[in-house]
Amino acid sequence: MKKFIKILKVLSMAIVLSACNINGIFASNLNTTNEPQKTTVFNKNDNTWNAQYFRIPSLQTLADGTMLAFSDIRYNGAEDHAYIDIGAAKSTDNGQTWDYKTVMENDRIDSTFSRVMDSTTVVTDTGRIILIAGSWNKNGNWASSTTSLRSDWSVQMVYSDDNGETWSDKVDLTTNKARIKNQPSNTIGWLAGVGSGIVMSDGTIVMPIQIALRENNANNYYSSVIYSKDNGETWTMGNKVPDPKTSENMVIELDGALIMSSRNDGKNYRASYISYDMGSTWEVYDPLHNKISTGNGSGCQGSFIKVTAKDGHRLGFISAPKNTKGGYVRDNITVYMIDFDDLSKGIRELCSPYPEDGNSSGGGYSCLSFNDGKLSILYEANGNIEYKDLTDYYLSIENNKKLK
């Protein structure tokens, strides 16, 4: 699909009355009669791609207000090991209408298993939009199916220099070793961390990654990062975080340090780490580590962004499912907030944009975005990808005098 297909998406008329329950001091400052409407951006019931399932949301809000949403196009169902491309949806009217485009195709080697998936995106200081994804052509789990570097695996990058109108051909980041520095010799494979990356105050691009390593005759997987100082031409890999079974993650910058919020399989809470040396070393970040429950059962991806409020307070927002029902249900995608300039307030719940149960075949993922006072979320909803504008909830914080 090389041309945009203009399709009008009608906003859902149903307002989810229980969508966002305001916690404590936010309630008095929010017009709760104006609950955010949902927009189905990627819909398994339309014929844009004739796909049976959409997963893995990534969201960017550009400087001019243009929104770019990304998703796996899972043609034959929710499965990870299947035939998958990556699609983008672009809106210039605050989500009322969307244009669609396939931005990364798989290698077309195997009609059942060729896939590119788990996109992670960033917008650089030059306005370039970079997307990184994992690529495979055979069946098997990315982290456990082999004991050495997988022969069918690569990490691919595409980019756009015109606000997502056109996209480059795929750039292989792993075949050419000059493009990736410091990749460990015991690597099984790696892929991006899912969601979005950041641009630091000095212009350095940082992308979260998850990496599988062969250690002591066993495979382990960890969270980490890669970073670029030349607008994505070459990348340097950081080291793994201290704990295995961490994987999908996102990072923010605070006073030159990197703070990570990570999936943490089997531990029932999200993990968090801080690095003062661009990922060469990591240590536990106590204000967030093991503070957000992810229920019993599987861990899950979550989003993590930093916002500077009008009063100068630096706020962190994290979205993740509570998973109160355990397993892979991943119900109640909730947005949490922490004030990095007043950690005594702890972590507070802002809202639950998706209070329903997730689809255990694949659900619970989300991606937050913030630009020019607008807070947005893209999330998985039973095989679709939905969007909500959470700006009213953000304004409830801005208007709260206790924050100042």
From Swiss-Prot:
Active-site positions on this chain: D80, Y365
Kindly report, in one word, the top-level EC class recorded for this enzyme. hydrolase
According to its UniProt record, the EC number is 3.2.1.18
Q: Which UniProt keywords apply?
A: Glycosidase, Hydrolase, Repeat, Secreted, Signal
Pfam families for the chain: BNR_3
Q: Which domain of life is it from?
A: Bacteria
Q: Where is this protein found?
A: Secreted
Entry GO terms, CC: cytoplasm; extracellular region; intracellular membrane-bounded organelle; membrane
Record InterPro entries: Sialidase, Sialidase_fam, Sialidase_sf, Sialidase_trypan
Mark the BNR repeats by their residue spans. 89-100, 158-169, 226-237, 273-284
From the Swiss-Prot or TrEMBL record, what is one GO molecular function term?
exo-alpha-sialidase activity
- In the UniProt record, the signal sequence range is 1-27
**Record flagged with keyword Membrane:** no
Function comment: Sialidases have been suggested to be pathogenic factors in microbial infections.
Query: Which family does the record assign?
Result: Belongs to the glycosyl hydrolase 33 family.
Protein name listed in UniProt: Sialidase
Give the organism, scientific name.
Answer: Paraclostridium sordellii
